[in-house]
Amino acid sequence: MVPIAAIRRKLMDGSISHNELDELKKDQRKGVQELLKRYQAQQEKQQTLIQMHKQMWRYEQELKQRGYVAVCGVDEVGRGPLAGPVTACACILPDDFQLLGLTDSKKLSKAKREEYAKMISEQAVAYSIASVSAAEIDEINILQATKKAMTKAINGLSQKTDHLLLDAVRLDVPIAQTSLIKGDAKSLSIAASSVLAKVWRDRYMEELAQTYPGYGFDTHAGYGTASHLQALRTYGMTPEHRKSFRPVLEESQGLIYGT
């Protein structure tokens, strides 16, 4: 009888054969059946991730079949916060790109986003990140600022793109484009841009927390949490706050940080 420790090793390293799996199903030892159950659950999860990856790659593949060469995903983060920039990323992935589990950055943990961002940046054909400041958001409004950040990111690419995949927006640029509702959960290129933009902006807000202690920018990234609203009432607005966003003026009562 094969020791349970040996079975565990074979299951973990993937060296077990179909015949061996069939034999394990007949093994009545509780430890073996528990190992087998976990293994099967992992295999099912892996297959789910593979299918999701294929599904999220279909837009890029269809565009390549139509003759487009450099399909670029574009996404933004930071439209809703009361402070900080709106940040966009444009990303072109290679044809053989594979990163199982990649999806909308909002669905990933901070640790996963950091891990994936490193892998994406290493594998990408090209990517570019751009931001528009809170002051400029106040001048031109958040929608126009978002589009400007996206356009800046596209223009910053080291390789020219011939088709854009966008998340529920259209840009006034002379490039063919496809807009997808909830695109960051439907396209790998958009998801990759979502992750890169999110990680970059979060790091920016963490640095901002050192400049303006007491606001908690490193925890809420500028969103209107209860603690952030309280900080506005206590300390007032910083230059990084969006004065055109009603809660900023209402909660700060016009108080300026440091005065």
Curated annotation (Swiss-Prot):
It is found in: Cytoplasm. Its main location: cytoplasm. PANTHER family: RIBONUCLEASE H2 SUBUNIT A (PTHR10954), RIBONUCLEASE HII (PTHR10954:SF18). Belongs to the RNase HII family. Manganese or magnesium. Binds 1 divalent metal ion per monomer in the absence of substrate. May bind a second metal ion after substrate binding. Keywords: Cytoplasm, Endonuclease, Hydrolase, Manganese, Metal-binding, Nuclease. This is Ribonuclease HII. Residues 69-257 form the RNase H type-2 domain. The keyword Nucleotide-binding does not apply. GO terms for biological process: DNA replication, removal of RNA primer; mismatch repair. Pfam families: RNase_HII (PF01351). Endonuclease that specifically degrades the RNA of RNA-DNA hybrids. A divalent metal cation binds at D75, E76, D167.
